[in-house]
Amino acid sequence: MGMDISQFDFLYDTSEETKTRFVSFIGDSMKRFDLAITSSNRFYGKKLVTDIQHGKTAIIGPDDLEAEGYLEYVFKLTEEEAAELTAFLEQVVGTVNFTDI
């Protein structure tokens, strides 16, 4: 038997307009990246980055790009592939905003 919606304890349930950039590129490693990069009012200005080919998504800001091994872990990349993705995302992610605290 399914759960009635009144049985859920929602932490939040909101809708908002977002902006999504779709981009596909290949670097020196010959790894093809097909990404959807979503900008939202959530996540302190970080971007929601989705690898469309593999169905993996991460919330990424400049601090995440500096975290050693993070992109390799999240997107299952080699070190060379992660370096290429980092080089691209450094141009995209911008700064983190803590305006909603």
Question: Model-derived features: where do they sit?
Answer:
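Short amphipathic alpha-helical "recognition" segments used for binding
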Residues: V23-F25, T50, Y70
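Generic, ordered loop/turn and secondary-structure boundary motif
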Residues: Y12, I26, Y44-G45, E66
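Helix-rich interaction surfaces within compact, conserved domain-sized segments
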Residues: L65-I101
